[in-house]
Amino acid sequence: IADVIDDDDSIIASPADSMLGITVGAICGETHATSISGENIIAPYSRKGPGFAGFSKPDISAYGGTIAFDGHKPITPIDKYSLVMDRGGMLVPDAGTSFTSPVVAGDLAEISKIVPDEDLLISKALLYHNAIVLWDEDDIDEEELNLAHNLYGRGISTVDESKYSSASKVTFVRTGTLNREKKERVKVFMPELLAAQPGRNVAKGTITCLSNPPIDRTKGTEYLGAYIRASINKSNPTGSFSKVQPKYKEGRRKWDVCHQFSKKFSNFNAGDWQIWLEMFGRWEDGNNDVPYALIVTIEDMSGNLDIYNEVELLNRYQAIN
């Protein structure tokens, strides 16, 4: 599989490198003896990034079948990820991103059913935000994370994590517009139960900000007219705020439509933290109102605390499902 990944012909090409589209990769769901790939590894036929102007692609992945060899002939082995229905209504094994893309499209459609007005930008942000990563988040460097994103995107698409909070994991959703003259300071409540927990890395915050900027194909590599930068700022006992520096630059590039990062916390104050949002434009008429969807998740890493109830008792947030 390493030889396939290193082949320049395996790189994602137009139109799959579109910044505003959802590019879907394929991950093998099972291991087969005569396949060059295996479970949770990029499928032999799935293309890798980077995409346009060096930005990470694919955006997200789904499980699919693999390609194996029966003597000298390539075949698609039968497993629960390779079976598709043919024109005669029979289940047959087949493989390709043509089959993983509908999986992600279906997930997006299901998520949209619980989102107010079936808002596509919020649905898409939730899809990206809750993708299941296929790498060790605690033991990966910048270069390795960039490679992972160019093989797997943000991870495996999942519906349930995108539709619901849980007792120990609370997700906040906000949508709006930004321009050059307007900045957002979005308040997010950090539960007291969580702040009182002793130990290291007791809490995790994950932020995804997805924007829908204007585009102009005549601008070449600058066809994307704007981007929104997101940062997290934790509260101090004095009432001031301290900007939190994420571990990686990956996921926070200028002129990307999606800024996404996470951070674990050990010692911190409860109360209102802030997500700062700022828009940057680069055309002469670049002061457009740019729609965005912001998703923020606060998680108890022990899984034992009911932080959802504490947030609910504030009576400040409206449940959307």
Range-by-range predicted roles:
Residues 1-18, 92-95, 99-101:
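Substrate-binding/access-modulating region of protease and related hydrolase catalytic domains
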Residues 12, 223-237, 265-321:
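C-terminal edge strands of extracellular/lumenal beta-sandwich accessory domains
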Residues 24:
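Alpha-helical segment proximal to the catalytic Tyr-Lys
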Residues 27-101, 118:
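Catalytic-core environment of secreted peptidases
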Residues 100-114:
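Short, small-residue alpha-helix embedded
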Residues 115-139:
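An often Trp-containing, charged/polar helix-loop segment at the C-terminal end
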Residues 146-234:
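Secreted peptidase-domain scaffold signal
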Residues 218-260:
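Surface-exposed beta-strand/loop patches in noncatalytic accessory domains
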